[in-house]
Design a protein with these regions (language model features):
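Soluble "head" domains of membrane/secretory-pathway proteins
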Residues: 1-247
Length: 247
C-alpha cells in the first residue's frame, strides 16, 4: 500500500542465479530467495531462457555444456497487477523499458494515458482514452509492449488506442552505450519494468511476463523449404516441443 502525495516506484531487476551444476555447491540447500545471496548478484537483461528442454546435463559427474540459444535479450514484456484506487486523485503508472525508450501507461480514475520517454517522445504524443476505473474500487490492470505496439487491458477488456499505440523503434546512438543486441543498461537492466504510485493505492498480485523468442542458429538448409500443411476450418495444428533449444 502506498499513501503519499509524491510519486514512488517499485522497480524489477532480473537476478538470474546460475544453476548449481556441479562440485560442492551442487546440493547447496540455500534457497534462491536468500537475501544475502541476492545482494551479491548483479542484474541482467531479461532473456529467453526456458527451463524445459534447456540442453543442460543434470549429471554433475559428466561435463556440462550449454548448447541452447537461450541467452538472447527479450524486450517484449507484459506487466499486470490488481490495483485499488483510494481516491479520484490516485495515479498509478505501469512502465516498461525497451532499448532507448521507456513506455508508460498512466491510470487514473476515468482515464488512461500512454507516454513514450526518450527518443521519439514528441512524435508519439500522449494518446489518452476514457476508462472504467473508479475511485474506491479494485481493478485488474495489464500493460504490454509487444511488436512495437502498446496494449492496455482493464478488468479483462482491451482499451483501443488504434494506430496511436504503434511506434517506430529508435536505433540507439553512441551516447546510449547500447549492447549489440540493442538493450540499454540504464533501461533494460536497471529498470526493465516498474510501477509508480502517487497518492493512495494498494497493489496486489503483481506479475511480469515476457514474450518467447524462437531462434535458429544451426538448422540444416533444407529446413528453409518446409512442407505445406492445410488446416481446415474448425481444426487446428498443434506444435509441441517449443523451447529455444529445439526451435
Amino acid at each position: 500500500t502506498h499513501d503519499h502525495p509524491e510519486q514512488h516506484w517499485i522497480r524489477y531487476r532480473h537476478l538470474a542465479h546460475p544453476w548449481k551444476r556441479r562440485g560442492p555447491d551442487a546440493h547447496d540447500p540455500t534457497p534462491p530467495t536468500d537475501i544475502a545471496q541476492l545482494a551479491q548478484q548483479k542484474p541482467l537483461p531479461i532473456d529467453n531462457f526456458l527451463g524445459y528442454n534447456a540442453g543442460r546435463d543434470a549429471d554433475n559427474i559428466r561435463a556440462w555444456r550449454d548448447t541452447s540459444q537461450d541467452r538472447l535479450w527479450v524486450g517484449d514484456l507484459f506487466l499486470e497487477a490488481e490495483v485499488q484506487f483510494a481516491s479520484s486523485e490516485t495515479e498509478v503508472v505501469f512502465e516498461l523499458s525497451r532499448g532507448v525508450n521507456r513506455f508508460q501507461a498512466q491510470f487514473t480514475p476515468g482515464r488512461v494515458t500512454l507516454r513514450r520517454i526518450g527518443k521519439g517522445a514528441e512524435e508519439f504524443g500522449t494518446p489518452s482514452r476514457p476508462c472504467r476505473i473508479q475511485a474506491g474500487q479494485r481493478h485488474h490492470l495489464r500493460f504490454a509492449n509487444v511488436d512495437a505496439r502498446l496494449w492496455v487491458w482493464i478488468d479483462g477488456r482491451r482499451v483501443d488506442f488504434g494506430p496511436e499505440a504503434n511506434y517506430l523503434p529508435m536505433e540507439p546512438g553512441p551516447e546510449d552505450q547500447a549492447d549489440p543486441e540493442g538493450w540499454v543498461y540504464a533501461n533494460d537492466v536497471e529498470r526493465p519494468a516498474s510501477i509508480g504510485v502517487k497518492g493512495k493505492a494498494t497493489v496486489r498480485h503483481l506479475v511480469l511476463s515476457r514474450d518467447i523468442y524462437y531462434t535458429s542458429a544451426r538448422l540444416p538448409p533444407d529446413f528453409s523449404q518446409p512442407d505445406v500443411y492445410y488446416v481446415q476450418p474448425g481444426h487446428y495444428l498443434c506444435l509441441g516441443d517449443n523451447s529455444a533449444q529445439s526451435s
